[in-house]
């Protein structure tokens, strides 16, 4: 019995060692078999889904955190008063000035249109200039008007409306045409009806529309910087789309010089609107001297036509403006619209 107990303990230990040895052998065999299987198996191509997932992971790793992302800043509205305004500026009318010179000074203008790059303009403005045989005056005006409007931080475009042929000049009808053509390009907020021979002297005379029709030429050098006469509403005026539609635009029947601006004033008054003006020390213009144009003689019939305005304004204006477009050309500094507008009725 004493001999039997030691033998039993010894056998039990060997039994444990045997179980442990067998277990380790099995694990070693499994590991060896798995490694050989992986090595000997053919390489399988990655699935498209695997590649996409890998790309997504790579993109996520390469993408900086949100606070490092560079997104373009949102444009804010331009200030009520532009910080670029200079006030009264000295005007020069160089005889050597060329169109290329003016284009070179206004690189930000494309096809007559400009928009501030650093803020959103408070109003979009179409400047309409009736024209015939006044190339030098137009050049001087463009040279000063483009930087003038840019300093005011406006979104604007300039339209030059040329009367084709040699019939008597009709400023008012050309302005109706300019208005209708400009609206084909953009839904402008404000329209500036601008004579080609008047150059603004002070950029605080801001070319935007008001709640009432606005007259911008309070004084000019030719009149000692005084209003030409009480009720004068010519030279340069500003009206919104709604205001201009409300009066049915200009009359189409004023051939030759004079009367059409007074007709527009009567239309404004008939609609119970009030003409507003900037301060006299700001609304100043230089009129570039010129002789009376051939084909733009004084309209001797203007007083008779003015007497009929209250009777005919509803059917004589934008709704009766007929014309034929001869040429529409988008030049660097302005949109040229050449039209045939007919002849005066005898």
Model-predicted regions and their roles:
Residues 2-7, 12-62, 73, 78-99, ...:
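C-terminal catalytic/acceptor-binding lobe
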Residues 17-22, 126, 137-140, 144, ...:
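Acidic, Ser/Thr-rich intrinsically disordered and amphipathic helical segments
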Residues 76, 117-122, 129-140, 164-166:
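Active-site beta-to-alpha loop of glycosyltransferases that engages the nucleotide-sugar donor
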Residues 89-118:
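Short N-terminal or domain-adjacent regulatory/targeting segments
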Residues 105-114, 134-149:
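Short, well-formed alpha-helical segments that are part of the catalytic scaffolds
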Residues 123-130, 145, 157-160, 178:
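Hydrophobic targeting segments
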